[in-house]
Amino acid sequence: DDLATAAADLSTSGTVHHHIADMGVKGEPAGFVEWAADQMGGVDIVVSNVSAMAGPDWEMSCAVDLIGMDALVRASLEKMDDHAGCNVICIGSRAASVAAPRIAAYAGVKAATVSAMKTLSREVARRGIRANVVSPGDIIFEGGVWGRAKEENGKLWEMIVKENPFRRLGTPEEVADVVAFIASERSSFVTGANILVDGGATSGLQI
């Protein structure tokens, strides 16, 4: 119901299709791609934003964030024509570039995502296809961990805001703008990159 409501809200600015698939279940990522290709007449761009957010559960994190992501991407590549407009974008995380306690599984699979896309970018370049990662930092949105912290844990919220050079957190729209740029022909010579959208939070680190 929530997905249908969101799709209806978004449809005011264009055509929106919605579909439910479990990226951790074998066959479902490919099935989703088949459905999407049928609905839209093919696949030119795929954005993989899947994440189990499974805490310390390595098995679940790998099943969704790595194996599910790879299945989604590989199925999409089979539907892509060989031309410069096609590209793959995976949503990574600043966590792949920094050390933080209690997120080893999440950070590990996001680091693996960056490495996988660098490799993929070399595999598909001759087809004219690009592959990149967009890695958000701390992003605030309704229902998210930082949205809850702002409401319920003032000390944690103040600390996380002070850690960012801009003294604020990012928004989903700021991440989406970067994804839209990477998906467009304006970034036609960008591939194999990991673009951080973190307000400079990692700028003082050697990575």
Region roles according to the model:
Residues 57-62, 160:
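Substrate-binding pocket helix/loop in short-chain dehydrogenase/reductase
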Residues 125, 130, 190-192:
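Short, small/polar-rich loop/turn modules that mediate ligand/substrate recognition or access, typified
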Residues 93:
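Residue(s) in the substrate-gating loop at a strand-loop-helix junction
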Residues 78, 122-123, 188:
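Alpha-helical segment proximal to the catalytic Tyr-Lys
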Residues 180, 191-207:
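Short C-terminal tail/terminal secondary-structure segment
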Residues 126, 136-163, 204-207:
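A glycine/serine/threonine-rich, flexible loop-to-helix segment
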Residues 73, 109, 117:
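Active-site helix of classical SDR
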